[in-house]
Regions:
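Extreme N-terminal leader/activation tails
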Residues: 1-13, 19
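Gram-positive cell-envelope targeting signals
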Residues: 1, 110-111
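Acidic, low-complexity, intrinsically disordered interaction modules
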Residues: 21-110
Length: 111
């Protein structure tokens, strides 16, 4: 049995744990590369938003790690980012991720 077949046999819980791990890994990579400290509360907020967006993504097929990377990059550039996107529509955030539009939430705030 090859590794792909073994992966397909994982339980839903194990698959979820792998997704959460990939989200944490992306947050860690950005924080390390940007040399920033992110509080546990913000890490949890980014993780939860990334996971919710990943589950909500029906059309763009974005990976959980890609979503987490984008959100963490936005936070690294503007530490008020999470507050600013708290009430935004998920489709707007997903579209921004797909377009690599790191300033999308600024446009929303100006409206």
């Amino acid at each position: 049995m090859n590794s792909l077949e073994r992966y397909k046999m994982l339980s839903n819980e194990d698959k979820s744990n792998l997704t959460i791990y990939s989200i944490y890994d992306s947050i860690y990579d950005v924080a390390k590369n940007e040399d920033i400290n992110i509080s546990d509360d913000i890490v949890t907020d980014i993780k939860e938003l990334a996971y919710d967006l990943y589950l909500d993504d029906e059309y763009m097929n974005l990976s959980a790690s890609q979503i987490a990377f984008f959100l963490t990059e936005c936070y690294a550039k503007d530490n008020s980012f999470m507050d600013k996107v708290a009430d935004m529509d998920y489709s707007d955030i997903l579209q921004a991720i797909d377009n690599d539009n790191y300033d999308f939430y600024k446009d929303e705030m100006e409206r």
